[in-house]
């Protein structure tokens, strides 16, 4: 018999999108990034969070109706990325190197993976912060 803790209640069921690894454009992104060394993919606050160690380097919405991929780049890469009309500065975190990109299908997934690879490499090189 499993011990029951007071106040825990019955947990919620896992949403189908989570159990399948995403839906819409998130699924191919999750499949690709899941094969990269050291990448951890976890749902957080309505978005897929892409981590290297404890460092968040990108996030994408869980809902298939939303398409805004957020990527954290180095400041040099951010300047390079913003030369492309399809990429815009993040509405709140542009000062920290974040950019946004609409990912609705295969053409944008290729572009996104190129910038995600740069973000992953930069995040993997950064030293872990002491907590």
Where are these regions (language model features)?
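Charge-dense, helix-prone N-terminal extensions
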Residues: 1-131
């Amino acid at each position: 018999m499993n011990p029951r803790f007071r106040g825990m209640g019955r947990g919620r069921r896992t949403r189908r999108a989570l159990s399948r690894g995403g839906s819409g454009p998130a699924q191919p992104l999750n499949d690709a990034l899941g094969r990269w060394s050291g990448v951890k993919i976890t749902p957080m606050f309505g978005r897929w969070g892409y981590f290297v160690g404890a460092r968040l380097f990108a996030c994408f919405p869980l809902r298939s109706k939303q398409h805004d991929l957020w990527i954290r780049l180095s400041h040099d890469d951010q300047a390079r990325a913003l030369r492309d009309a399809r990429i815009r500065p993040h509405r709140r975190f542009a000062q920290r190197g974040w950019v946004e990109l609409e990912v609705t299908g295969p053409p944008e997934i290729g572009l996104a993976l190129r910038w995600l690879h740069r973000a992953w490499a930069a995040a993997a090189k950064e030293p872990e912060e002491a907590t």
